[in-house]
Amino acid sequence: MQHYYKVSEMENRLAGEAYAQTNGAWVEGERLIFGKLSIPEGTSSKPHSHPNEQISLVLGGRVRVNVEGDGRVLEKDDINYRPANAVHSAEVIGDEDFAFITAKDTSWGIQGNVATPEEAARKGGKDAVQHYYRISEMEDRKAGESYAQTHGTWVEGERIIFGKLSIPAGTKAEAHSHPNEQMVIVLSGSFHMNIDGDERTLVADDIAHIPPNAVHSGEVVGDEDYVFVTAKDTSWGIQGTPVKS
């Protein structure tokens, strides 16, 4: 199984070509689809939906998003949660492409379905879930405290756990595993990772795919914190279980 990917070496593909010019690269695992995508400036993503849940983090640019009538302008480090089958759309604002990291569960593919006019007009009810999060306003929590100093913020959906985390310079993540699948993309810093004996030093825009129950560990390389976006399926939580050597 391939554990490591470089976005720069992956095929740039269209995602949602029936309703948007969204393009980028992604990895399809057993339970998660995870990738780095962008929507060109001056374009929009028409109302659409898909049976799978989706969570995204803005990397750059500004976008006006609407989820079931709940609208918000999103900028860097904002998170957008789209429940399964929620009708949503987006319009890129300004003269910069909208770049984002996204995760979906594999109950459906990367492509959505164009909404009918009736579906596009649908509004969420009073019990609608929270669709938008700003990392600067979220609690910084520990993740994996029994084996690493990993910390950050994350959103837990019905099927996906998704967040932005970091591991301090000069520290390690000791060997651990978890029953859920995990995907990681590096934002900054460098990290030497070992997944079931397969080792690689990761830098910005590298993706790691950690299968369920795979034993993995790592060490931050250099004097910069290792910052990454990660997704896990919800068959287990954010915390893993240490593995004794």
Task: Please tell me what each predicted stretch does.
Residues 52-63, 180-182, 186-191, 196:
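Glycine- and acidic-residue-biased ligand/ion/polar-headgroup-sensing regions
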Residues 84-109, 212-238:
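Ligand-binding loop in jelly-roll beta-barrel domains
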Residues 37, 56, 80, 165, ...:
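Conserved GNAT-family N-acetyltransferase fold
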Residues 44-45, 64, 80, 84-89, ...:
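Histidine-centered metal-chelating micro-motifs
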